[in-house]
């Protein structure tokens, strides 16, 4: 991901993601849409990268998105639990500036991706 680019929001119904940023730095935002979860409707941020190595497990029904922060391109690796189904993708999206999730990606007005 290029600096200041935002890729958000999406979630999966079946798939669990396991993500790490191996070069550069990204801000990962998570929004829990799982009814009955103790963290239902909560937002979390995780900064991760080559200087802050973490592996984040993202369960189904948790919206997530990234913003590359810093001056260099960021590289993210994902190891999902499901193979990609081209005929019926397990991916559901919202725009970065959706009103359904009260989160500010720091985008200029009208700009969808930095």
Model-derived regions, located:
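Non-catalytic, conserved peripheral segments adjacent to functional cores
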Residues: 1-55, 69-114
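Conserved SET/PR-domain catalytic core that frames the SAM/AdoMet-binding pocket
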Residues: 53-65
